[in-house]
Structure formats: structure tokens, C-alpha cells
Curated annotation (Swiss-Prot):
Keywords: Acyltransferase, Cytoplasm, Metal-binding, Transferase, Zinc. It comes from the Bacteria. Its EC number is 2.3.1.222. InterPro entries: PTAC. This is Phosphate propanoyltransferase. Zn(2+) 2 binds at H143, H145, H190. It comes from Enterococcus faecalis (strain ATCC 700802 / V583). Its cofactor is Zn(2+). It is found in: Cytoplasm. Involved in 1,2-propanediol (1,2-PD) degradation by catalyzing the conversion of propanoyl-CoA to propanoyl-phosphate. One of its GO terms (molecular function) is acyltransferase activity, transferring groups other than amino-acyl groups. GO terms for biological process: propanediol catabolic process.
Amino acid sequence: MNKLDSMNEIVEEVVKRIQQQQQNTFEVEASGRHVHLSRQEIDALFGPGYQLTKVKDLSQPGQFVCKERITVAGPKGLFQNVVILGPERSESQVEVSMTDTRILGINAPVRESGKTEGTPGVTLMNGSAVVTLSHGLIVAKRHIHMTPEDALKNKVSNSQIVQVKVEGTRPLIFDDVVVRISPRFATYMHIDYDEANACGLTKGARGYILK
């Protein structure tokens, strides 16, 4: 094999790999600030036994937007009409962007959902009802919800960290993206509004994992 043949093989392999990556694309969604509430906080904010009102399903099976809204407050500022996502959880959690943390005046860490140990608290308000969480404020780590079938196609494992190229008006490669695999999931990548603005995200935008 001469040098030209060898180069052609390398080029063909690279092209094949890129084509395979682009075939395994998934939709990228932007998540705005939102709250997950436990039964304890629901009772405190809305009254004992109150049931959250579902108004719209989300892309992840079983998760939904609630009609109810609350205020999230920090030492420097607050956000009104913050959406609550259901169903209720075992522990309350508030997810915001980096920009939001500066407005609130609270230095929240980047964490995976549910990993709230050692995170700062924040105040939740609904009218005269006020609850101050001891912890639970996070900036959500960018992540991909993935079915086991799509994980096989993409050759990734649960909790693996990958790079993702997001196509759009400002194409961008996101590093440090965690893959979360479950048969309960639908395959979508989630980023926050800061990240969405950085890549000029539009509805229906897609991304793919880089190897």
C-alpha cells in the first residue's frame, strides 16, 4: 500500500465516522428556571394535601408542567411566576442558570439533578406562605436523557461524560455533558437558557455526540 492509498483510507474512515455521528442525532431542549417540590413544601406553600395541577406534558415520560407558580427569592433579588414541574419529589430542588444566581445573589454549584448535598438554600414564596430551603439550589449540569437503545447506537454508558456538537445559527461544541440512561427516558439533551443563547438554539435543533 502506497502513501496515497493509506491517506485515502484514513479520509474514508473519518468521513464514515462523521456520517455515523450525524445519523445518531437527538433533539436539544432549553430548560428555564424551575422548581421541583416535595410533599412537605407543597403542603407549606399551598396547604395540607394540596395536589399540583398538571397542564402540559414534558418530553420526559411522566414529567409535566404545573399550573401553579411561585416566587424564588435570594438576598439580592427574586424571580416571580417560576414554574413548578411535577410530579412531586422526595426532596425539593430549584434549578436556575448562572445568570440567575447572580440576580438572586447566591453562588449555586453546577450539579446533576438530585445531587443537592452541600448546596445552598433559597426562599420560596406563594402569597403569604414562605418556605426557606436549607439546600437544593443548583445550576443543572448539561445532560442527555437517553434510552438504552439509543445508548447502544451511540456506544455510551450511564454517567459517561461526552462532548456534543449542537447545530444551529451559532454551532457550538459542549464539553462535560453527562449521559443518563434509563428505559423510562426519551432521548433529549437538556441545556439551560445561558447555554441555549450561546449556541443560538432554535426549536427542533439537534446535536450529536463527538467521539
